[in-house]
Regions:
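Nucleotide-sugar donor-binding catalytic core of glycosyltransferases
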Residues: 1-267, 272-311
């Protein structure tokens, strides 16, 4: 089960909440039965944690929020939509933007303790960025996914996938002893090519081969840096894979960036800011810094919405 994983991962966060969908579907705005059951049941309590898909926020605001009488943590994600303004129900033919007023309505609710949101670009003292982490659920749900190295007879469970990651970590060397270039792995990168073109080509090492994720992971640990553009939302599973594998992801800024504070991440306003001088300076600075690698762990984040509020 994902909620027993070591590293932070999207579905592990979901399954660690007190109330969550028993059959989650990413970016699905109609997954609401468990919320209705929660309201109609008699098992709510103070400081409970409620997980919702980002796409469910309008329903939650209109139909669930007014009925909440207990203090609660809200945790949202399992979607590419930004909070706010992202397009929700993106994959099911009914695309529309997530209005900021829904988010503000939640934030002013007197029983809200804090809201932890994936792909969050809204700044408010009660809302905090939450990582999407590693993706274990795709291969677990579909063992035939090309990401899985079937030739190596890899298992598909979250536990097995995490074992692969841990084994690669055992062999990796520090980022400052690696090839000081920017690793790029993209097989279908038309919409990201503009960003990549802004980086001097002599600084990058491109691998455009389609290959299982394990082989990509083994490539990552050879390099100090990696190009890590936004996914369909600003956060991306690749960001967290790179961090777990000791590589410095180069990421365009979004929101308040506090999620990446005290982690070895090179945040730029534009990829045109990337130069040899910047890479050299970053390696020199990061080599002597003490980072908080606990932020890569599931427990670090779950503890934030599992403990009672501070008095």
């Amino acid at each position: 089960m994902e909620n027993n994983c070591y590293f932070v991962c999207s579905r592990s966060i979901l399954k660690s909440c007190d109330f969550h969908s028993p059959n989650p579907s990413s970016s699905w705005c109609y997954d609401t039965d468990y919320l209705i059951s929660m309201i109609n049941g008699n098992n709510m309590f103070d400081t409970m944690s409620i997980y919702i898909c980002t796409d469910v926020i309008p329903f939650f605001t209109n139909d669930i929020l007014p009925k909440l009488k207990h203090s609660f943590y809200l945790v949202s994600g399992d979607s590419d939509a930004t909070v706010p303004h992202g397009h929700i129900d993106l994959w099911h033919g009914n695309r529309y933007p997530l209005k900021e007023e829904y988010c503000l309505e939640i934030l002013k609710h007197p029983k809200l303790i804090k809201w932890y949101a994936q792909n969050c670009i809204l700044e408010h003292n009660k809302i905090h960025q939450l990582p999407i982490g590693i993706d274990y659920h795709t291969i677990s749900k579909d063992p035939n996914k090309f990401w899985r190295d079937s030739e190596a007879n890899e298992g598909s469970s979250p536990k097995f996938q995490e074992m692969i990651l841990k084994n690669i970590r055992k062999e990796m060397i520090p980022f400052y002893k690696r090839i000081p270039k920017i690793f790029v792995h993209m097989t279908n990168y038309t919409h990201r090519q503009d960003d990549l073109n802004l980086i001097p080509q002599e600084l990058i090492e491109i691998n455009s081969n389609t290959m299982p994720r394990t082989k990509v992971w083994k490539e990552m640990v050879n390099y100090s840096f990696a190009f890590s553009p936004w996914g369909n939302g600003p956060d991306c599973h690749r960001h967290w894979e790179l961090l777990c594998l000791g590589c410095i992801p180069i990421i365009k800024s979004f929101g308040d960036n506090k999620m990446f504070k005290n982690l070895p991440v090179l945040i730029v306003k534009e990829y045109s800011d990337v130069t040899q001088e910047l890479l050299d300076k970053t390696l020199t600075q990061f080599k002597v810094m003490n980072f908080n690698y606990n932020k890569l762990l599931l427990r670090y984040w779950v503890d934030k919405f599992s403990s009672p509020p501070s008095l």
